[in-house]
């Protein structure tokens, strides 16, 4: 089981969407993945994100690589994860 995999639900740690949950849709390379909220559920737009800015959760969604926002939204509703996705997480920024 890989931690960074298509369908893994993660929490964004930085940026304007910090604390919001998103789903990994595609793996671009060793450092970047394509994520979506989708925007209608968690407010996260479909975009490329550095994996160091994500915190993976233990939940996954069964989607195919490159799935559309509508497909992701349908799977989230099917698995009953919509309320989980809407919850915000308080992000703790480490002090250096």
UniProtKB/Swiss-Prot annotation:
One term of GO molecular function: RNA binding
Membrane-spanning residues: none
Protein name: Large ribosomal subunit protein eL14
Organism from which the protein derives: Metallosphaera sedula (strain ATCC 51363 / DSM 5348 / JCM 9185 / NBRC 15509 / TH2)
Biological processes per GO annotation: ribosomal large subunit biogenesis; translation
HAMAP family noted in UniProt: Ribosomal_eL14
Parts forming coiled coils: none
Keyword vocabulary terms for this entry: Ribonucleoprotein, Ribosomal protein
Disulfide pairings: none
Keyword Transferase (UniProt): no
